[in-house]
Curated annotation (Swiss-Prot):
Keywords for this protein: Ribonucleoprotein, Ribosomal protein, RNA-binding, rRNA-binding
Stated role: One of the primary rRNA binding proteins, it binds specifically to the 5'-end of 16S ribosomal RNA.
Protein name, as recorded: Small ribosomal subunit protein uS17
UniProt-recorded Gene Ontology molecular function terms: rRNA binding; structural constituent of ribosome
Keyword DNA repair: no
Any one biological process term the GO annotation gives: translation
Signal peptide (residue range): none
InterPro entries according to UniProt: NA-bd_OB-fold (IPR012340), Ribosomal_uS17 (IPR000266), Ribosomal_uS17_bact/chlr (IPR019984), Ribosomal_uS17_CS (IPR019979)
UniProt source species: Endomicrobium trichonymphae
Pfam family, one: Ribosomal_S17
Subunit composition and interactions: Part of the 30S ribosomal subunit.
Family in the record: Belongs to the universal ribosomal protein uS17 family.
GO (cellular component) term, any one: cytosolic small ribosomal subunit
Length: 87
């Protein structure tokens, strides 16, 4: 049996939980510009599959790359790292 390649993991913050079993997660990364030697920040939004609807807006979550689940969903929720307090 063939082994799967190494999967990518990201940590981000849930920015939308309006859809059932689907979350929008914003992932921020920092990198240094090669020419100007300045630290830059960039954000990416990922559409994530949340099978049990356990995450909510503001939660910090860990996501993993997976096979395509729909037109935009290619990531799956692995765990909720830090929950926000319910007000």
């Amino acid at each position: 049996m063939a082994e799967r390649g190494k999967r990518k993991f990201r940590t981000g913050i849930v920015v939308s939980d309006k859809s059932n079993k689907t979350r929008q997660v914003s992932v921020e990364r920092t990198y240094r510009h090669s020419l100007y030697d300045r630290v830059l920040r960039s954000k990416s939004k990922f559409i994530v599959h949340d099978e049990k609807n356990i995450s909510h807006v503001g939660d910090t979550v860990k996501i993993m790359e997976s096979r395509p689940l729909s037109k935009m969903k290619r990531w799956v929720l692995v765990e909720v790292v830090n929950k926000t307090s319910e007000i």
